[in-house]
Structures are given as C-alpha cells and as structure tokens.
UniProtKB/Swiss-Prot annotation:
Binds and compact DNA (95 to 150 base pairs) to form nucleosome-like structures that contain positive DNA supercoils. Increases the resistance of DNA to thermal denaturation (in vitro). Residues 52-55 are annotated as: Interaction with DNA. It is found in: Cytoplasm; Chromosome. GO terms for molecular function: DNA binding; protein heterodimerization activity. It comes from Methanococcus voltae. Pfam families: CBFD_NFYB_HMF. This is DNA-binding protein HmvA. Belongs to the archaeal histone HMF family. One of its GO terms (cellular component) is cytoplasm. Keywords: Chromosome, Cytoplasm, DNA-binding. Homodimer or heterodimer with another histone. Dimers then assemble into higher oligomers, with the DNA wrapped around the protein core. The record marks K12 as: Interaction with DNA. Its main location: cytoplasm.
Amino acid sequence: MIPKGTVKRIMKDNTEMYVSTESVVALVDILQEMIVTTTKIAEENAAKDKRKTIKARDIEECDAERLKEKILQVSERTEKVNMLANEILHVIASELERY
C-alpha cells in the first residue's frame, strides 16, 4: 500500500549507498507494521476520551516508549532487513527518545 518508489527515493536521498529492491520491500513492510501499531495506540487514546475519531493529537500522544520498543523489535526480527533499513529504524527510534 505504501508506494515503494517514494520509500526508495527517501532512502536514496539519505545515503550515498545503493538501495536494493529487497531493502525497499523490507522497509515498506516495517513501515506498514509501524502504522498499524501507531493506529492501535492512537485508537486507545481516542477511546479514553470516548471518541470514535482518531485525531492528530492521538497520534502525537502515542506512547513513544511503546513505539520505540516495536520499532526495535521489528528491526531485529529478521535477517532480511539489511543494514540500511536497520539503520533507518534505529534513527527513528533515537528520534523518539527525544520526546
């Protein structure tokens, strides 16, 4: 569902290394899992406020620690995730630590 071309372009814009199709597919799968996890946490946030609509603040208020844990879990889950995709996930996780 996430456009592979967009992901590949973002990856290539942030490295001087070559980006394999396999790494793009692996990262797309991981990003989709992250979206599902974030949505579930945001849904819990909306439900606490007795709403049926997920709002931006629900996403912003996602528990950074749970998201970080999931990101690291996914990045270490399989050997199919190559070094570049793994590094991108660690950068995302470290950015979450700031919040």
